[in-house]
């Protein structure tokens, strides 16, 4: 939740193929996508981008960077992404597959010395796009639910509207980087994130209140990572330690009103509560040695 959002204020995107667990830990067996945010400029900068398209699409971003002193810089970015829906919910009248997102980010860099820098950043995002409800590809076979297939694949008959679709996420980070000498650098990354979301999930995509799931999700996580980086003529790499404390809470109903009526159990539903806490730590290292200009040998491990 809170992860599938448009990306802005990014310098580059790195697609890392294959297992990346040595450096990035859990859930990276198939690879990782790394977003590198744009650093702050020593010169005043301002950039504006606007994109327009069909379905009344208007996307806009504003980014700015300002050097306050020779050693202190601040920056900010805001973004808005809006588009009408491709389809329509024939029951509620809402647009289906629309987009309504807002995001903002502020950052600051402070050079405490020529070889020591602090970087702080905070971000906020809000997604109020309607829930993307499903489209049935075959008609129902059981009366009285003989609904014909809709002509537009983007249209839906989902009737659940107990909660609105809403995803709100925010977080911050503090990075300290100390260049000890030409070869060694110490880097510390402190971060916190939190998100809250509500989502109406209509599994049968029909107006009847059956297999309808209004869901609420809340997540937060704190992480700390300390790295010792080495850069030499042929050998490059790092060793580090990592700690994560995360919590995830979920509350959702499975509304089974139609099934309950058939079973003489009016108002049948199954309510589920979930609360998961995760605390994890690791030590890791990864080094690459250049054998020639074309060949290199990498060795890494994580515990």
Regions found by a protein language model. Name each.
Residues 12, 32, 47-49, 59-61, ...:
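Membrane-embedded beta-strand positions in outer-membrane beta-barrel channels/transporters
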Residues 15-16, 44-47, 86-92, 152-160, ...:
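Extracytoplasmic loops and strand-loop junctions of Gram-negative outer membrane beta-barrel proteins
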């Amino acid at each position: 939740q809170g992860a599938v959002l448009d990306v802005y204020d990014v310098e580059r995107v790195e697609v890392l193929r294959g297992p990346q667990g040595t450096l990035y830990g859990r859930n990276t067996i198939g690879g990782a996508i790394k977003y590198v945010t744009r650093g702050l400029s020593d010169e005043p900068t301002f950039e504006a981008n606007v994109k327009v398209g069909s379905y009344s699409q208007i996307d806009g971003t504003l980014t700015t960077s300002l050097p306050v002193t020779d050693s202190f810089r601040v920056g900010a970015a805001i973004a808005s992404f809006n588009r009408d829906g491709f389809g329509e919910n024939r029951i509620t009248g809402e647009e289906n597959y629309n987009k309504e997102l807002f995001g903002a980010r502020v950052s600051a860099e402070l050079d405490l010395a020529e070889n020591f820098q602090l970087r702080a950043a905070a971000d906020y995002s809000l997604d109020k796009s309607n829930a993307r409800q499903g489209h049935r590809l075959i008609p129902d076979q059981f009366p009285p639910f003989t609904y014909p297939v809709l002509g537009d694949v983007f249209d839906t008959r989902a009737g659940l509207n107990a909660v609105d679709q809403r995803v709100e996420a925010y977080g911050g980070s503090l990075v300290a980087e100390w260049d000890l000498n030409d070869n060694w650098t110490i880097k510390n990354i402190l971060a916190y994130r939190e998100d809250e979301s509500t989502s109406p999930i209509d599994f049968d995509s029909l107006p009847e209140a059956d297999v309808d799931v209004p869901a609420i999700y809340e997540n937060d996580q704190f992480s700390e990572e300390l790295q010792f980086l080495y850069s030499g003529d042929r050998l490059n790499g790092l060793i580090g330690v990592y700690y994560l404390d995360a919590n995830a809470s979920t509350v959702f109903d499975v509304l089974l009103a139609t099934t309950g009526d058939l079973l003489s159990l009016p108002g049948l539903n199954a309510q589920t509560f979930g609360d998961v806490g995760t605390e994890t730590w690791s030590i890791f290292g990864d080094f690459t040695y250049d054998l020639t200009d074309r060949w290199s040998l990498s060795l890494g491990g994580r515990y």
